[in-house]
A protein has these predicted regions:
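Glycine-rich and polybasic anion-binding loops at the starts of cofactor/ligand-binding domains
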Residues: 1-161
Length: 161
């Protein structure tokens, strides 16, 4: 009879495959941050109903599904116009990814930068390392740790002092 693997083992296997693919295009500090976050998750696993903060949340389906990486983006040319006029900025995400071409970011105030986190890491690696490298989720936040380990990108917002 085959041994049933626990959820943490499944995520660790999936992480190893992604880490191998990322090693050539991510800085070492980010790979280490991801590994540290996975270690936090691995030490605690998915919370269950015995965990006070999660007693009303059943994560059994997540434990059976495992992690499925987001598919590459398909190109989209436009988004529906807002019902009311927008006098301001618009940040568009499609399938969890920042879409600068569809966002309205013209005439940002001086000193304000909005871009994808991946672009910022490439453009300002030392700054991002200093801001991110010590941000490991605590053991009481296993889903935050799992998110940190597997995240693909994000939004970078910098407002100069």
């Amino acid at each position: 009879m085959a041994k049933k693997r626990n959820t943490s083992e499944l995520f660790v296997e999936q992480f190893a495959a992604l880490a191998l693919a990322r090693k050539d295009h991510e800085p070492a500090w980010l790979l280490a941050l991801r590994q540290d976050a996975l270690d936090v998750f691995q030490a605690t696993g998915l919370p269950d109903r015995k965990t006070e903060a999660w007693k009303y949340t059943n994560l059994n389906k997540l434990s059976k599904t495992g992690f499925v990486p987001a598919q590459p983006l398909r190109e989209i040319d436009s988004i529906p116009a807002p019902i009311l006029p927008v006098d301001g900025y618009r940040i568009v995400f499609f399938n969890g990814r920042f879409q600068p071409a569809l966002s309205l970011l013209q005439s940002l105030p001086e000193g304000v930068i909005i871009e994808s986190l991946g672009t910022a890491i490439t453009r300002e690696p030392a700054l991002l390392e200093s801001q991110m490298s010590h941000r490991i989720p605590s053991r009481d936040m296993p889903l935050s740790a799992l998110n940190s380990a597997f995240s693909e990108d994000g939004l970078y917002l910098r407002i100069a002092p």
